[in-house]
C-alpha cells in the first residue's frame, strides 16, 4: 500500500470514530502528517509504510510536540524490516508506539486494546505482577513451587512479579495454570515521556529550518520579552512560543512560503487549542491568514511583552 493510501485509510478511521482531523502536512521536511483530537485526547500522527524510516530526529520532534501539547505521539505503518506488522501488536521506534492501521481500527472502533509488544526475540506481553503474586499466594505456592511447575527458574518468577514482561507463550501457560487473566492490555492513548528529554547528537543547538537558513532574530526577540521558546526541526511550525499557560505555534520564513504554511499552522492550532503566528522577512503588512496572524520582522520588534503578543494573535482581523 502506498503512503497516500495508508494515510487516507488512517484519516477514514479517525473520522469514523469521531476525531477532528487536521489538514495533511505537505511541507517538507515533516515530522508528522496529522494532528487529531477527540475530547481530551490529542494525537500527533506520523504515517509511513516502513516504520524503520522514522529516524531519531523525527522521533525527537514527535516527543517534543507531545510534551508541550500534552499529546500522544503515534506512528502508523505497515512493515518493520520488510515484515508486516502484526495486528494487535505494538512496536517501538525510539520510545514512540508504532502500530498497523488495523490495530488502530481495532482500538478506536472496537475498543480492543493491544496485548502484545514487539521486542528483539519476538512478541511479549506485560503481566499484572500484583495479580500473579496474589494468585500464587492464594494457592500457597512458593516462588520455587511455581517455577518448578512451569519449568523455569525461581529468579524468573520473581522478575515476573517485579513487573518484567514475558513471551506470549509463557503468559498463556501462566493463565492456563491459574485459570485467570494476568496479561495487561496496552493503552495506545497513554504516553509518558522520559523524565529527561534526550536530544540526538545530530541536532545542533538552535533552529536550522531549511537550506535557505532563516535568521535568528524572531526567536531571539521573543525570548528577550520573556517568552519561553521551544524550537523544533521538522514540524510545519518552527517553535512553541509559551506565555502565561498559552501556546503559540510560531513559524518564520519568506513571503513565498507564507500562505501555505500559515493556513496549515492555523488549522493545526484549531485542532490543538493553541494560537498561531507567522513572522515573515521583508514584510510590512499585518493580517490574518485563516487563524494565523502574519506579521513582518520589524513589527515583531515593536512587541514589548508577552501580553502584547497574546493580544495580537487573539484579535480578530
Curated annotation (Swiss-Prot):
Residues 199-219 are annotated as: Disordered. GO terms for molecular function: DNA binding; DNA-binding transcription factor activity. Residues 209-219 have a biased composition (Basic and acidic residues). CDD domains: HTH_XRE. Keywords: DNA-binding, Transcription, Transcription regulation. It holds the Pfam family HTH_3. Residues 132-189 form the HTH cro/C1-type domain. NCBIfam families: PRK04140.1. This is Putative HTH-type transcriptional regulatory protein Mlab_0160. The keyword Transcription applies. Gene3D superfamilies: lambda repressor-like DNA-binding domains (1.10.260.40).
Amino acid at each position: 500500500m502506498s503512503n497516500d493510501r495508508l494515510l487516507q485509510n488512517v484519516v477514514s478511521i479517525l473520522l469514523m470514530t469521531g476525531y477532528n482531523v487536521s489538514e495533511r502536512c505537505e511541507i517538507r521536511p515533516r515530522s508528522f502528517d496529522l494532528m487529531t483530537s477527540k475530547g481530551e485526547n490529542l494525537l500527533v500522527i506520523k504515517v509511513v509504510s516502513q516504520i524503520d524510516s522514522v529516524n531519531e530526529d523525527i522521533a525527537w520532534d514527535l516527543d517534543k510536540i507531545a510534551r508541550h501539547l500534552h499529546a500522544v505521539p503515534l506512528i502508523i505503518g505497515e512493515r518493520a524490516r520488510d515484515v508486516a506488522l502484526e495486528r494487535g501488536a505494538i512496536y517501538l521506534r525510539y520510545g514512540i508506539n508504532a502500530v498497523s492501521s488495523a490495530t488502530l481500527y481495532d482500538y478506536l472502533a472496537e475498543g480492543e486494546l493491544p496485548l502484545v509488544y514487539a521486542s528483539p526475540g519476538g512478541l511479549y506481553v506485560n503481566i499484572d505482577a500484583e495479580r500473579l503474586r496474589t494468585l500464587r499466594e492464594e494457592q500457597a505456592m512458593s516462588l520455587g513451587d511455581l517455577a518448578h511447575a512451569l519449568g523455569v527458574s525461581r529468579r524468573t518468577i520473581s522478575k515476573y512479579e517485579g513487573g518484567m514482561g514475558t513471551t506470549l507463550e509463557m503468559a498463556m501457560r501462566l493463565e492456563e495454570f491459574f485459570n485467570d487473566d494476568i496479561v495487561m492490555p496496552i493503552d495506545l492513548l497513554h504516553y509518558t515521556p522520559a523524565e529527561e528529554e534526550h536530544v540526538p547528537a545530530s541536532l545542533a543547538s538552535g533552529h536550522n529550518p531549511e537550506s535557505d537558513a532563516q535568521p535568528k532574530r524572531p526567536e531571539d526577540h521573543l525570548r528577550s520579552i520573556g517568552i519561553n521558546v521551544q524550537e523544533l526541526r521538522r514540524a510545519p511550525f518552527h517553535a512553541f512560543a509559551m506565555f502565561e499557560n498559552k501556546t503559540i505555534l510560531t513559524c518564520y520564513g519568506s513571503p513565498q512560503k507564507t500562505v501555505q504554511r500559515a493556513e496549515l499552522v492555523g488549522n493545526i492550532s484549531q485542532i490543538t487549542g493553541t494560537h498561531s503566528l507567522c513572522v515573515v522577512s521583508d514584510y510590512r503588512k499585518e493580517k490574518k491568514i485563516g487563524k494565523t496572524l502574519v506579521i513582518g520582522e520589524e513589527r515583531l520588534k515593536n512587541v514589548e511583552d508577552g501580553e502584547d503578543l497574546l493580544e495580537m494573535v487573539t484579535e480578530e482581523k
